[in-house]
Amino acid sequence: MGTVREYEGQMALSWKKQSAYGTAVTNTDLIQALRMTAFPDADFKPDMVNDEEVFGKGHEWATEQNIERFNTALKTDFDLTSHSAAFLFAFLFGNVVSTQLEESDAYSHVFTPMAIATTKQLPVTSMVQQLSSGFKKLLRDMALNEVSLSCSVKDRAKITGSWIGSGFYGDSALATMPQLITSPYLKSDNLQFKLGTKASEVDRSTDLTNLDFSFSNDALGDEGYRFDGDGYRRECEIGKRKMTLKFGLRLAHDSDAEHDRLFAQTALSVIMDFVSPVMVDETYPHSVKIEIPNLAYTATPIKVDGKVVGHDIETLPMYDETLEGAVQVTVVNDVPEDTYLAASV
């Protein structure tokens, strides 16, 4: 029958979270599949210990090797869509409020980082990776450590998630792999980029050249092992969360506003609103909006892109008293309320 090709692979996902760490999402809830832009290579690499350095053997060679701990990691790469963004931000932030929009077929999902006073355990989900009829693996207890989103005027917007699992990587009994979801792409020309003081942001979309956003949970992977854990991670908690935002702006002839904002440490707000021309229904389009209501510049170096002069701007996102956080993401799509982060039972 020959060997397996990369393009034969499929991945089953779920919008739902596991009911508990160590309890997989049920097969009836593993019904989602998203278009990925790169092969999702599951890194299953147990920590090994051998006796190569042990004294007294009379030679330099190892005579035994044992698995001490299990570990899994996975990277998922997507074009930015309302479905890929909602899936990743749900498990990245761990908190969502969803509402139906005026009896339409559209739903608004507002994602914010969960309050660590309530829980520090990241929500976890399960995935199934099928590479052939003889290779179908369940990845259990997958927590999302980091999401990065990038966009330039020349390319589609991309979004990537970096996952960390318990180390469980076993055979799956999922009978049928799901079909890919049809989801409109959110491109660079779908982005409205607003920048300015809070509530007075100005559209700078025509000046924007590139955009890089990331949010990390600093997941405490090594701290998740226990004496009674038989080598598997038993929890995955938040460490010290960190967010970055960098973007490029063309330099105007009549203004040095970005340098002025750096030296004055002006409190600024950024709204990045990707709005698709494809509608969920007659009223509401697919969209992803990222709001950072309080930030300051940390650097505004000059750059030359081709023949055009601009700024490469680096920022420090900060806590906002009104939001009671530092970032909020709103996604509009056709996924009903009470779906994202619902417990699989």
Annotate each predicted stretch with a short phrase.
Residues 1-345:
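Signature of extracytoplasmic/envelope-associated structural regions
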